[in-house]
């Protein structure tokens, strides 16, 4: 099933039970929850969204299990400073969700990047992700070309999403 673009976030309402099989509402809520967790930049917190034996492919790196996820994210956020991420539901079916995303960050030399990508997720019966496949491309940008300007942490509900920003 394909997702409808521009779905409004309803973070002020109670979250439905986010387990498969996903509906449009639960898939979109799952995507926003993942975005919020990643924007925390807390590797331990993020890792809890994945099974202890989770399998990832992130670019050309293979990551297996929560311990490796924590180590991977710790390295990532030491390099990718002032990281801000937007995820958008692309498609869903059963226990699978496809997402497109963009994030902005800079390195320790002050060089800014916007990274674009797609993720394919598969969840266990408890709604915990056990497979994550990510393809990512990096685009150098000028600081003046940044589009993600909220304070570090959770993206505000009124901040535009990827489609709204024309990305």
What do the PLM-derived regions correspond to, one by one?
Residues 17, 36, 59:
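Short, flexible active-site loop motifs that bind/organize anionic cofactors or intermediates
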